[in-house]
Regions:
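Transmembrane alpha-helical segments that form the functional core of multipass membrane systems
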Residues: 272-365
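Membrane-embedded alpha-helical signal segments
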Residues: 1-306, 324
Length: 365
């Protein structure tokens, strides 16, 4: 099971546990018993009580989410050598939590943080001990090219942002992060170049993401559909790519990028109809070669749209347009078909679509 899938299941367990006990109001002191009450029936929760320098310390963490080596070297070992010093000075990566926000504390716990209660000091700390497991950066299978970079996005938001930072080393690249999904608490990032992107469009995208109310997002296409202007339009209003070089080129054109943690794709907005005829390799070819390839794609579009209808129209209503020899052959072949041409064509199109869908969905191994 992927860490994100496991984490979603844990959030659901915590949501069930919250129904058994109310969260404390902001400013109220949080106790270890509250953590145990909220994390009721979560078997992978580890709860330890340590005595460090004659002081009792309660420790909470989730086994599958925490790297035990990091926990020992960055938390337990420094505390054992602290000699009664302030834990904030001993643990440089620790963050205090003194506002009584239990929901935030539970969210950090479910993200792989370790929670420490220093009861005598009335101090609560959380340390990021998350065990980072991610897929290696590989070639893009959906947008394979011969020329240009061969890397693609993965399911980790931080890695995807680093791939873009390596290409756009400018302070004008702005990254605004949000947390969406009432149950999944997905992290989503909005990227744009401040000196190029349209400010009105940027604010519009930010506002829509902030106003999204949904239980959880399992992928970027779900979020994409909730941000569209015209959800019933057959044409995509967001571009979707898994290549960092495509995203960098879109940012330089003034586009806005949306990246969701857990998704190996990035959404580009706004999108235009003509972009559907572009290939990632067009940027690395000469303009004449790229233009010729785009013209071929346009020609293929018109052939796809008009060929079937032209066949039915000529064969049914305008047979005089065909040469006599070809008309004779078609008439002989049609005499064995019990359906009119329009039914025949629809049946053939349906069979081809079924075969194509089966070829895509069938397991390859």
């Amino acid at each position: 099971m992927e860490p994100t899938d496991w984490w979603r299941a844990q959030v659901f367990k915590v949501a069930q546990a919250k129904s058994r006990g109310a969260s404390p109001s902001r400013g109220e002191r949080i106790t270890p018993e509250m953590i145990k009450q909220q994390m009721y029936n979560v078997d992978d929760l580890s709860s330890l009580v340590l005595t460090i320098n004659d002081e009792e310390v309660h420790v909470f963490f989730l086994d599958p989410m925490v790297e035990l080596t990091k926990l020992y070297e960055n938390v337990f070992l420094p505390l054992q050598r602290s000699d009664g010093k302030d834990p904030l000075n001993v643990l440089p990566y620790a963050q205090p939590c003194r506002e009584g926000n239990l929901d935030l504390l539970l969210s950090n716990l479910l993200r792989g943080h370790t929670i420490l209660f220093f009861l005598e000091r009335e101090l609560i700390l959380h340390v990021n001990t998350f065990q980072v497991e991610h897929r290696a950066i590989t070639k893009s299978e959906s947008e394979a090219t011969v020329l240009g970079p061969q890397d693609s996005f993965v399911e980790m938001l931080e890695i995807n942002l680093s791939l873009l930072r390596r290409r756009l080393t400018t302070p004008n690249l702005k990254i605004v992060a949000y947390t969406i999904g009432t149950e999944t608490q997905n992290r989503v990032a909005v990227l744009y170049l401040e000196n190029i992107a349209n400010e009105i469009n940027v604010e519009r995208v930010k506002t829509r993401i902030q106003n999204v109310e949904y239980q959880g997002f399992v992928g970027l296409p779900v979020l994409k559909q909730m941000l569209e202007d015209k959800p019933y339009s057959p044409f995509p209003q967001f571009g979707l790519t898994s290549r960092p070089d495509n995203v960098a080129a879109a940012l330089l054109d003034g586009r806005i990028i949306i990246i969701l943690n857990g998704s190996p794709d990035a959404a580009i907005c706004p999108a235009s109809f003509l972009e559907m005829f572009s290939s990632p390799e067009d940027f690395y070819n000469r303009w004449s070669t790229a233009s010729l390839l785009r013209m071929i794609r346009f020609f293929g579009l018109f052939v796809t749209i008009l060929l079937t209808s032209s066949y039915v129209s000529v064969l049914t209503f305008h047979p005089e347009m065909l040469p006599p020899a070809l008309l004779t052959i078609l008439s002989e072949s049609r005499s064995q078909v019990p359906f009119p041409p329009v039914i025949e064509v629809i049946f053939i199109e349906l069979v081809i679509e079924i075969l194509r869908e089966a070829g895509i969905r069938m397991p390859t191994k």
